[in-house]
Amino acid sequence: MKLQTLLFCPADAERKVSRALDSAADAVILDLEDSVAASAKAAARSAAVHVLAGATTRPDLVVRINPQDTCWYLPDLVAVVPHKPRAVLLPKCTSPDALRRLDHHLEALEVANGLPAGMIAILALVTETAASLRCMAYDGVTPRLRALLFGAEDLAADFGISPRHVDGTLTAPIAAARAALLVAAAQAQVPAIDTPWPDPRDPAGLQAEIAAAVRDGFAGKLCIHPNQLAPVAAAFTPPPERVRWAEAVHRLFMDHPTSGVLVLNGKMIDRPHLKLAERILEAVACTSDEV
């Protein structure tokens, strides 16, 4: 599942959904949560089912359900699982136990609907308050987990602060949680996906945040407008010279499988360099062969 560009749209906004489905997004997230008013939850759920029922293979369809502590959570799952979304996005995920509950509910509904157990993947939008940062051990929780997603806006609301300074950089508590999520994703061996840039009319701000995300090790970025997709995709696609370096590192270690340290173009490389090279080649494979 390619996760460089994930585009949110309200499930009940027909025009926005149509535009999203025609976009170059890797995945379209049909939102049943924040962008849908309480009075419109049932209608949005029905709209999501309609989209899923008529889905083609491109882009992948993900449904952001409502949080587990709401009355809409189970009805959302009951409605969408029979129509086989590529993944379910769990918002406000505050602990591994939340993923275990979702995994249990998905398996029960898959079996009830004659679907293979484990068919539907999970994306977790992690909202970590100061009290729950110590609980970010997501490794081994469920094989459905495909990525951890960072949500700066939800977290800032929990803290009662602004997520960003005037210059666009993240405020200290948000930056700390972002770093913790990167570590948690690495431990769980899943990609980390960065928070959306909130202003589609500010391409300079978007570019600055994308550059930081790439530098810090995120694998993709959430988007809230189609015009954010191209710059995000371009930034997360490894440049040709980086790909050539990765291919050379990989080839050198394949030729010398018992070596721990080698020399490439006069520079020492070791096993951590091989891991980095493999990540780069995996990103290239996802770009050229979307699974």
Stretches found by the model and what they are:
Residues 1-291:
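Expand to "…catalyze enediolate/carbanion chemistry for C-C bond making/breaking, isomerization
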